[in-house]
Amino acid sequence: MTKFVFVTGGVVSSLGKGIASASLAAILESRGLKVTLIKLDPYLNVDPGTMSPFQHGEVFVTNDGAETDLDLGHYERFVETRMRKANNFTTGQIYKSVLEKERRGDYLGKTVQVIPHVTNEIQDFVKRGAGWGTPDAVDVAIVEIGGTVGDIESLPFLEAVRQMSLKLGPNNSAFVHLSYVPWIAAAGELKTKPTQHTAKQLREIGIQADALLCRADRPIPKEEREKISLFSNVPDWAVISMWDVDTIYKVPRMLHEQGLDGLICDKLRLSTPPANLKRWDDLVYETAHPQGDVNIVMVGKYVELSDSYKSLNEAIRHAGMKNHVRVKIDYIDSETITPDNVTQLAKFDAILVPGGFGIRGVEGKICAARFARENKVPYLGICLGMQVATIEFARHVAGLKDANSTEFDPSSPNPVIALITEWKDADGSIKTRDENSDLGGTMRLGAQSSDVVKGTLAHKIYGDVVTERHRHRYEANVHFLDTLRKAGLVISAFTQREHLTEIVELPQSVHPWFMGVQFHPEFNSTPWAGHPLFIAFIKAALDHQAAGKALKAVA
């Protein structure tokens, strides 16, 4: 039977529940257990797909086309299990499901209430995410509850997991609570009172934590941990210090050395081999011992919040490790880039233009793509980054004056990028939309395969077929492809059903490394394997750097 670990948070948000949950899952997986993770988000949005990146950060897309919380990206990078739609749900989804059941008459005329109907629905969703009662059932499901204890929004979730723990019976569930222990500089000490209070709030709800993870900017001394233990009704050996580290890949070892996985296995009566964290140790060693540095610039619309590009940042770092270098990423707001100042990009070894929505900052991205093309700087455009590269090429090489996307200029005489009206979804179903369709849930989403043209840079990287995850509404307009090809643009991958453009590039005889992809390869990168596209991109940046040094040496 599947056992559950419920992870809650207190005092403040953004303490790292996702990293803590993923790290615990990684340790349990190293013990030979089949593990999955589920994220419960207490907001009323059906999913984060229409939320601003400045508010929510990145929207992580699963293979089956779910737009989910960025924590699912952490989960996939830490464990072998691939996340699905069932691994993330929101209050909006819960209420939507409950109201649909009420309309169908499923409740047989009863008054529909938060308890038991909403709480039962939450429990059903959690079990579905764990594959409960199916051949896909896991040994342990780690359930992360978003928000903080004390929030009104979180109460139905906390009540649901309290009830679920009771129904599961002894030794089938455990509670891990993450709290904050601030360092007060004026007093010169760590303060445990916030953690004492949040543990008390949790008990008032009816939940007793089995382990407390105490976040601080430094290791918490034994005396403070004993004090927390006394006032939180948690054994001192279950009060675990979680301090700031220079890489998140140190966290599994940190938690293991303090016995968190042993505590959980004892609580759940799980008999397993010892944890084997060698690959984590090797990973940390690799990050700490680079053989060089490479500098890339990301020209984006949401650079004020680095979480907006979380998976992309990680994918670049993974590729750096595979090339044995440390990648330094500079972020430049595309709104600030103009033809007059675009030469500031010359100091970088490569240029990356990520995805985005809306017209703001687009001309700056087009300037960046033009600079990379004309100055033979390695360029990788992702989603919108591929589209702006296509627009730039159309304007300045193919002679299509005023070329644009219908997203930015619906009346453009040369709409080289246009709205997709029909496509095959990740589940194989045919989807349609038009300009009047809702924004939410109407994009081309999830993993889809494309055929790669032989003799191209894309084929060197991917081989015959590329399967990547998508999240977009607009595509290269098929009516302009012949014109673009004749001007020298290489269309190196097409979708298998609709023959939509998936990858564009320049011939290596013209540019050493210039590529735009319509999909989001960052969602498939892991610290163990990296990702072939990003590995090739960083290698190109290194080659560009070496060529620049050689020119300076000659001069």
Curated annotation (Swiss-Prot):
Catalysed reaction(s)? UTP + L-glutamine + ATP + H2O = CTP + L-glutamate + ADP + phosphate + 2 H(+); L-glutamine + H2O = L-glutamate + NH4(+); UTP + NH4(+) + ATP = CTP + ADP + phosphate + 2 H(+)
Q: Which residues bind CTP?
A: S13, D151, I152, E153, K191, T192, K193, P194, T195, Q196, K227
Q: Which cysteines are joined by disulfide bonds?
A: none
Q: Where is this region: Amidoligase domain?
A: 1-270
The UniProt keyword set, sorted, is:
ATP-binding, Glutamine amidotransferase, Ligase, Magnesium, Metal-binding, Nucleotide-binding, Pyrimidine biosynthesis
| A GO MF label | identical protein binding
Which residue range or ranges hold the Glutamine amidotransferase type-1 domain? Answer: 295-547
Kindly state a single biological-process term from the GO annotations of this entry.
Answer: pyrimidine nucleobase biosynthetic process
Q: Which residues bind UTP?
A: S13, K191, T192, K193, P194, T195, Q196, K227
Q: Tell me, in a sentence or two, what this protein's role is.
A: Catalyzes the ATP-dependent amination of UTP to CTP with either L-glutamine or ammonia as the source of nitrogen. Regulates intracellular CTP levels through interactions with the four ribonucleotide triphosphates.
Any idea what this protein is called? CTP synthase
User: Could you read off the lineage of the organism from its UniProt record?
Assistant: Bacteria, Pseudomonadati, Pseudomonadota, Betaproteobacteria, Burkholderiales
Q: Which gene encodes it?
A: pyrG
